[in-house]
Amino acid sequence: MAKLGTMPPQHAAKPVDEHAARLIPEDSVPIQTQKPFTTLSAIGIGYGVTNTAVGIPLILSTAMPMGGSPQVFWGFLAMAAVGLATATTLAELVSAMPHPGGQYIWVNALAPKRYRRGLSYTTAMISWVAAVATGSSGNLSVPLNAFSIVTLLQPDFVYRRWMGFAAFQAINVVTCFGACFEHALPKLSKAFLLFNVVSVGVIIVALFAMADARTSAKDFFTTVNTSGWPDGVAFIIGLNGANWCFSCLDVATHLAEEIPSPGTNIPKALLWTIFIASTSGLLVVLAVLVNLGPVDVSDYSGIGIFYRITGSKAAAIGLWIPVLILVLASVWSIQTWQSRLAWTISRESGFPLHRHFSKIFPAPFYTPIWSLVGSAVGTALFGCLYLASELAFNSLIATGILLQYISYSIPTVLVLWQGRRNFRHGQFWYPRLGLVANFIMLAWTVVAFVFYCFPANAQVRPSQMNYVSGVLVVIATFIAALWILYARKNYRVMEI
């Protein structure tokens, strides 16, 4: 039976019984004393969310109409560079200040005293909403891509929104339960990492082995833009898909209390995640584009492309099922991500019901169960929006990646504002390369913030409109209202 106890904030860094999970009352910091993660399992859960190689077939339907093969190839390389810059930026910050709160803790440490609480809370809520929006996207992606198998076998099948909604909510419940057991998380993350690598290898070999023809050099490098936007604008808008393949990089930073030596192990996990993502993702990009043949805009769904290349429905389905399993696994990883954010924010009294959300449950869980449930409820509510309006739901989940970049940018700007030379850095620190990485990430944040608010087609109909900018205003209003009505009086960062 695990021991229960308290730990005052000023003593939170002292060695503790590694087998004890502590439930902490008011005026103390609830800490996670279980440290089952290693660098490898942190890579597994981080890459499990990023899911780069598996994500390539999923984003082709949105990327190919914006520029064809060059859009996918050069766009992937561009986003790999942005991903490396983002991972480097986060690695420097977590090396200096390892903490499961991540971005909002860094902001609290770096911001001027006058603005510290407000900026820290804003960053915290942006991070959490980004995680819930991303999880909602994954919850819907699984059933939509599962029903694509039905469509391949039965072309007259008519998808109904309630089908996706029911599957969305079922997946939300199952993955929430699967994230409840602390000591199972690293084992599952390593297992899924291995399954991911093997599946990607099988997909690459199968596409090359079963393709009847190869794409000509002319087709490979010919831009095919059917969006109505100028080629340059279409290219940037089309980067959204590849950008998702290098998103959610802060996941590993929120494991700081669940891994030994987080100041060194988490930066390693971040950079290894980018290396694995870039290598495996590029191989899948080449496997698809080299074997796709002449550009045909009729069907760029992932399973449709697998069928087109292999010429076999059975082979296409056989390759598609591992993709679905890995997308489902990414939703499980996201449940861990968003719950850890809710838990740490609750430790600072950032949520109503924070006394419940901040608790670490004893054996056999050792996890913040109420934070898991609360975050899953938030995801479920987002799913209800899908049932009401698919357009509103799509605009909401599209904000996920922008909110991530905003949460990364706030502490980065504060580091630059006070001067990198004055920053008390950790072991992972590159004075010049780190500065370049900071500017690349910030520059891309600005570009993405502008162009990701554009609709995919220049000749847009109301049913295709992009309401991301409006959703961002709603989210900002929600955070401001929560601050004024609750957090201004209750929120306090106790760790720093």
UniProtKB/Swiss-Prot annotation:
Transmembrane segments: 40-60, 72-92, 124-144, 162-182, 191-211, 270-290, 314-334, 368-388, 396-416, 434-454, 467-487
Sites where a glycan is attached: N225
Residues of the signal peptide: none
Phenotype upon gene inactivation: Leads to lower intracellular accumulation of SW and higher extracellular yield of SW.
The keyword rRNA-binding is assigned to this record: no
Molecular functions (GO terms): transmembrane transporter activity
Pfam families xrefs: AA_permease_2
InterPro entries: AA/rel_permease1
Keywords noted in UniProt: Glycoprotein, Membrane, Transmembrane, Transmembrane helix, Transport
Its biological purpose: Transmembrane transporter; part of the gene cluster that mediates the biosynthesis of swainsonine, a cytotoxic fungal alkaloid and a potential cancer therapy drug. Does not mediate the secretion of SW and the exact role of swnT in SW biosynthesis remains to be determined.
Protein's UniProt name: Transmembrane transporter swnT
Recorded name of the encoding gene: swnT
